[in-house]
Curated annotation (Swiss-Prot):
GO terms for biological process: arachidonate secretion; fatty acid biosynthetic process; lipid catabolic process; phospholipid metabolic process; positive regulation of fibroblast proliferation. GO terms for molecular function: calcium ion binding; calcium-dependent phospholipase A2 activity; phospholipid binding; signaling receptor binding; toxin activity. It catalyses: a 1,2-diacyl-sn-glycero-3-phosphocholine + H2O = a 1-acyl-sn-glycero-3-phosphocholine + a fatty acid + H(+). It comes from Ophiophagus hannah (King cobra). The keyword Calcium applies. The lineage of its organism: Eukaryota, Metazoa, Chordata, Craniata, Vertebrata. Residues 22-27 form a propeptide. This is Acidic phospholipase A2.
Amino acid sequence: MNPAHLLVLSAVCVSLLGASSIPPQPLNLLQFNYMIQCTIPGSRPFLDYMDYGCYCGTGVAGHPVDELDRCCQTHDLCYSKAEEQPKCSSLLNSPLMKKYSYTCSGGTLTCNDDNDECGAFICNCDRAARICFAGAPYNKENKELDIATRCQ
């Protein structure tokens, strides 16, 4: 075999082995992003809500700093309840991974009847959070808080 071909083949194999250790992307968070965009046109959920307050994004500590942060806390609690459901306990059915179906028309979101028990539960968590987000003011001063001092 040509040494150049062998080098390319080796690089491809190493790349594939490396890619196999990359965890799957959270599919549900992408759906949740679309849900929010559907009901809050012009929003940028990943940018706007990631690292907001004490509960939006990866934070889960302390007291919510405002109404929007309380929405995220409630959403986190709903996901925790979903994980306690037997049908949602596996990795593929976890709240961050489980895909579900929904429709959005004129800003109204409906979780579809074809969802299984776990999908329906998670869809309703996301739907309730989306409704909460739509009614909560966004305070720029609560974006990228110093969690160590503000979220005790």
